[in-house]
Amino acid sequence: MPRKANLLKSLARGRVRTSFNKYNLFNLYKKGGVDLKSKSLYQQKWTAKQETRAYHGEHLTEKRWQTVFKPKLDSVAQLDASLRGGEIKETPFLLQTFAVLEKRLDFALFRAMFASSVRQARQFILHGNVRVNGVKIKHPSYTLKPGDMFSVKPDKVLEALGAKKPSFQEALKIDKTQIVLWNKYVKEAKTEPKEVWEKKLENFEKMSDSNPKKLQFQEFLRQYNKNLESQQYNALKGCTQEGILRKLLNVEKEIGKSNNEPLSIDELKQGLPEIQDSQLLESLNNAYQEFFKSGEIRREIISKCQPDELISLATEMMNPNETTKKELSDGAKSALRSGKRIIAESVKLWTKNITDHFKTRMSDISDGSLTFDPKWAKNLKYHDPIKLSELEGDEPKARKLINLPWQKNYVYGRQDPKKPFFTPWKPRPFLSPFAILPHHLEISFKTCHAVYLRDPVARPGQSEVISPFDVPVHERAYMYYLRNGK
C-alpha cells in the first residue's frame, strides 16, 4: 500500500514533489539550496534523505524503498580517445542514487509526460488504462526492461495534461464577461478602426515568438499571402488583350446609354473601380474610343449578350475572320488596328498595375505587418447579451446562444460536455517548467506511446536521472541508505 497523501502540496513544509501542480511549482521556485552547514553528519544525512525522498518515490514506504535500493550505481565509460588530453567533467555518480525508481512503470509514465504526477500515473495503471508491449498491466511497480513499449489511453493523457473543465455555472459567468468585452471591442473598432488595427499589430509584435497566439497570427498571415497570390495569379491570367476588351464590353453593357454617344472616361472609371492608375485608365479609354469608331461596338447586340457571348465577341473583334474584314470600311479597319495596338500597350500597364496592387497588400511575416483595410471593422457584429437567470441549468439552450468568433455554439471550456477535461483542449497552466524529457525514453505524443530505451546512467558532467537537488544532497542521502539509515 502506498503512503497516504497527507500535506503533499503544503506551502509551509515546501517539499518538492513529482507533480505538475502549481503549488509544487511555487515550492520549487522558493526552494533554496539545502542547508547542510552547522549540522552534524547524521543531521546532514537525515535532512538530505528527507528532501530527496519527498521527490523520489514519496508514495513508497521507507521499508519498501530500502528493499529496492541498490548501492551499485550505473554509469558509462568512454571507450574512445575523444576525451583524452582535455578537461573532463566529473561524473555525478551519486545522482544515480534513485535511478532504480526510473525503471518502474509509474515513474516512466510520469517522465514521459503521460500523467501529471506519479500518483496519477499509478491510478491510470490500476484502472487498466496502461499497456506494456500490448498487454494490459495493473501493477505500478512493474519493472521495465530495455526495449519495452508502453502506452496510455489518449483521453487519459489529455485529462492529465489539459486544463481543468469548468462547471456550467462558471462557464456561463466567463461567457457573460467575454460578451461584454467583445461588444466593447466592436464598438471601439467601429469608432476608431485604424487605431485598433495598429494596436492589434503592436500587441502581436510584442509577443514572444513561441506564444501560441503569435504563431496562430503568423499562420493566418501565411494563408492570407497564399490567398493573395492565388488572386494575383487569376487576375494576371485574365490580363490578355481579349480579357481587357471583354471588360470594356461589359462596362458598355452595364452603363451604356440608348443614344449613339460613346462612354466618357468618368463612366469608364465608374465601371472599372479596380483601376486606380490614371495612365492606364486613359489608355483603356483611348482603346475603347477607337473600337467604338470602328462600329463594332453595337449596343443593341451587346445589351443582350451573356458573359460567355461577350468573350466570343471580344475574340472576334481582336481576330476578325476574312468575311468580316471584307465588310469593314478602310476607316473601320484603321480604327480596329489602332484599338488593338492600344490594347496591347494596356496589357503591360494593367499587368504592372495588378502586380503593384498585390505587392502593397502582401504582409511581411517576419515583422507581422499587415496592410490596413478600411472595411475590416464593418464585418464585426455585436453579440446579444445573455441572462444567467434564464440559462441556469439549461446548457443546450446556452450553447445555441453563444456565437463569439472564437467560440461558436458551445459554452466556455465545454465544447464536448462528456469529456472530463477542458474542450477544445488546451494545456494546463504552468506546464512548461516541468516539460523535461529524459534521455532513456523515446516518446510519441501523437499516439501516446513511449519506448523504454535503456536504464538511466551517469556520464561525465551529467546524470540521466532528473532531480531538483545537486550532488552534495544526493551524496548524504546515499550515505544514509548505504548503512540502512544508521
Curated annotation (Swiss-Prot):
Changing S82L: In NAM9-1; suppressor for ocher mutations in mitochondrial DNA, possibly through decreasing the fidelity of translation. It comes from the Eukaryota. One of its GO terms (biological process) is ribosomal small subunit biogenesis. Component of the mitochondrial ribosome (mitoribosome), a dedicated translation machinery responsible for the synthesis of mitochondrial genome-encoded proteins, including at least some of the essential transmembrane subunits of the mitochondrial respiratory chain. The mitoribosomes are attached to the mitochondrial inner membrane and translation products are cotranslationally integrated into the membrane. The lineage of its organism: Eukaryota, Fungi, Dikarya, Ascomycota, Saccharomycotina. Component of the mitochondrial small ribosomal subunit (mt-SSU). Mature yeast 74S mitochondrial ribosomes consist of a small (37S) and a large (54S) subunit. The 37S small subunit contains a 15S ribosomal RNA (15S mt-rRNA) and 34 different proteins. The 54S large subunit contains a 21S rRNA (21S mt-rRNA) and 46 different proteins. uS3m, uS4m and uS5m form the narrow entry site of the mRNA channel. The keyword Ribonucleoprotein applies. GO terms for molecular function: rRNA binding; structural constituent of ribosome. The gene is NAM9. It comes from Saccharomyces cerevisiae (strain ATCC 204508 / S288c). Belongs to the universal ribosomal protein uS4 family. InterPro entries: Ribosomal_uS4, Ribosomal_uS4_CS, S4_RNA-bd, S4_RNA-bd_sf. PROSITE patterns: RIBOSOMAL_S4, S4. Its main location: mitochondrion. Present with 3270 molecules/cell in log phase SD medium. This is Small ribosomal subunit protein uS4m.
